[in-house]
């Protein structure tokens, strides 16, 4: 992937718009790489409905906006170079994801078919915070923006192009999370989920738990 990016470097230097398109395009490609962000939005949409899924997705999008904004000004590099801060982010974020995975598996260990007719209600900030913490605690988000911006953008890239790239990333993130929320909160999808609710929740919870344990392990061992 990075070799392909380098092939466009000459064009990027000549035309800042190419840098914008390439930056946003590479970000969109990551949507198809399953990670904690995807599974948290999917699980929330299935268990708690469209509103909860959208709010969780918006939290993830805000995290993307924050880290991409830092990356545009080189501040994200400072975070990764400070091992103590980077390790703390991993440990705290991993602990939160582990707690969420455990609660999800435990809550869904008994049939709750009524949730299909009446989605679980909670204050909006509960779901929004869930998405935000999940994204901010994911070191891959930081490393991605650092690596991509270091290749697609340079010191000569004008401010307007940087802002366009940032806006494109934020907009793409919002559209993708809302799409996921809509798709996995459809009545047909939730009915199918209800028929295999116990197994599905445990599988998704286990996947999120694996991401959480990896974050904690990396945070502890790489200090």
Swiss-Prot record:
<dbReference type="GO" id="GO:0006865">
    <property type="term" value="P:amino acid transport"/>
</dbReference>
<keyword id="KW-1003">Cell membrane</keyword>
<keyword id="KW-0472">Membrane</keyword>
<dbReference type="Pfam" id="PF01810">
    <property type="entry name" value="LysE"/>
</dbReference>
<keyword id="KW-1133">Transmembrane helix</keyword>
<protein>
    <recommendedName>
        <fullName>Uncharacterized membrane protein YahN</fullName>
    </recommendedName>
</protein>
<dbReference type="GO" id="GO:0005886">
    <property type="term" value="C:plasma membrane"/>
</dbReference>
<dbReference type="InterPro" id="IPR001123">
    <property type="entry name" value="LeuE-type"/>
</dbReference>
<feature type="transmembrane region" description="Helical">
    <location>
        <begin position="164"/>
        <end position="184"/>
    </location>
</feature>
<feature type="transmembrane region" description="Helical">
    <location>
        <begin position="59"/>
        <end position="79"/>
    </location>
</feature>
<feature type="transmembrane region" description="Helical">
    <location>
        <begin position="22"/>
        <end position="42"/>
    </location>
</feature>
<dbReference type="GO" id="GO:0015171">
    <property type="term" value="F:amino acid transmembrane transporter activity"/>
</dbReference>
<feature type="transmembrane region" description="Helical">
    <location>
        <begin position="85"/>
        <end position="105"/>
    </location>
</feature>
<dbReference type="InterPro" id="IPR004778">
    <property type="entry name" value="Homoserine/Threonine_efflux"/>
</dbReference>
<comment type="similarity">
    <text>Belongs to the Rht family.</text>
</comment>
<keyword id="KW-0812">Transmembrane</keyword>
